[in-house]
Amino acid sequence: VGSEMCIRDSPKDIVKKLADIGGFGGFLPTNYGGSEIDFTSYGLMMQELERGDSSIRVLSSVQSLVMNTIYSLGSDDQKQKYLPKLASGELIGSFGMSEPNHGSDPSSMKSHYSEEKDCYIVNGSKMWIGHAPICDVAVIWAKSKSNKYAGFIVERSTEGFSTAKIEKKWSFRA
C-alpha cells in the first residue's frame, strides 16, 4: 500500500466520487451546486474523510475554501461560471495565499497587483499551495502599492500562470 500511495500523482481519480456525495462546497446553495448542508454536517463529513486519507480531506477542504471565497466575494457572473463546475468536480480549485519566506502572513505578502485599462496585472510567487499542480482555477491573493488586498480568480490557461509539478509527495500520508 505504501509504495502505491507514494507514486499516485494526485487524487483526481476520486474527484467525481467526492462531488457526488457533496464533498465540495456542500454548505453552498443548490443553485451553485451545493447541497445546503449545515456546517456541523460538513465538519463530520470532513472528519470521516480524514479518517480514511487526510490528503483526500484536504482536496475537499481546499476545493470548498475556493468555492466559499468565490461565493462570498465573487460577482454573480463569477459564481455562475465557477461554482457549479467546482461543485461537480469538473474544475479543481487551488487557494494561493502562502508565499516563500512568509507563509500565510498577509502583512508580509510580496505578491502585488496593479490595475491596467481593462484588466489587473498580478505578479508574485506562491508556495505550499494545495493542489496547485492539478488545479484548473486558482484564487490568488495579492496587494496593491497602497496595501489594499484582493483575491483574483486565475484560470490555468492565463498567460504567465504556472505551477511546479510535485512528484512522489507523501504529504499527509506520511
Segments (PLM) and residue ranges:
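Flexible, small-/acidic-enriched active-site or ligand-binding loops
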Residues: 108-110, 157-174
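N-terminal glycine-rich anion-binding loops that anchor highly charged ligand groups
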Residues: 10-21
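A short core secondary-structure module
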Residues: 119, 123-164
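Short, small-residue-biased leader/transition segments that mark boundaries at the very start
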Residues: 1-7
